[in-house]
Design a protein with these regions (language model features):
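Cys/His-rich short segments
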Residues: 189
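Metal-dependent phosphoesterase core characteristic of DEDDh/y 3'-5' exonuclease domains
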Residues: 22-32, 39, 45-46, 74-186
Length: 189
């Protein structure tokens, strides 16, 4: 199983307000095995270079993401079905790249918490705080703009934020797996 998260510039605009098309800034993922615990999560990632970000060119990073995705028997993430997977597919088709294997099972932790739980919020950061985990750094609007302008410091901050998302997503996934397995549901099958 691998899990991944994306960070993309321009996620929430009216199409009339889009001056520059959105593109992938970075991606991060982690392999999950039977030995994976919240204390030994190894994150892999790729980020645009400053020059790529200035041009909005995510082609190279997309290739590395698809290579990573193609090695997995399952994909997992918080809202992966409604957001991450669809954003990847959009960027791939717009970059005239091949599609990863769409028969791979997707484990969506957002769908799972909505199906089995009723928390005050279903945001990943909120779940992690409630589970006693360290919260996520904050990305401000200006950080996103700096990334798009090719600011290396902002791109590094975005990648750290993205890696935190993956670590948090794995922690929630492992918690959900153990909890649901105790009730007879194996989300990894």
């Amino acid at each position: 199983i691998n899990t991944f998260q994306l960070k993309q510039y321009s996620d929430c605009l009216s199409w009339k307000d889009i001056k520059d098309p959105p593109f992938l800034l970075c991606w991060s993922g982690a392999w999950i095995t039977a030995e994976t615990t919240k204390d030994n999560i190894r994150v892999v990632s790729d980020s645009l270079t400053a020059a790529e970000a200035k041009r909005g060119n995510d082609k190279r990073s997309l290739k590395s993401l698809v290579s990573y995705m193609d090695m997995a028997d399952k994909w997992a993430g918080h809202n992966i079905k409604a957001f991450d997977s669809k954003k990847v597919m959009t960027r791939l088709i717009l970059n005239h790249q091949s599609c990863p294997d769409l028969t791979v099972k997707q484990i969506d932790t957002l769908s799972l918490v909505k199906k089995y739980c009723k928390n005050d919020s279903n945001a990943l950061g909120y779940w992690l705080e409630r589970l006693g985990q360290i919260g996520k750094d904050k990305m401000e609007s200006e950080d996103w703009d700096k990334c798009k302008a090719g600011d290396q410091k902002a791109l590094n901050k975005m990648l750290r934020y993205n890696k935190q998302d993956v670590r948090g997503g794995v922690i929630l996934l492992l918690e959900l797996h153990d909890f649901l397995l105790s009730g007879g549901v194996d989300i990894f099958k």
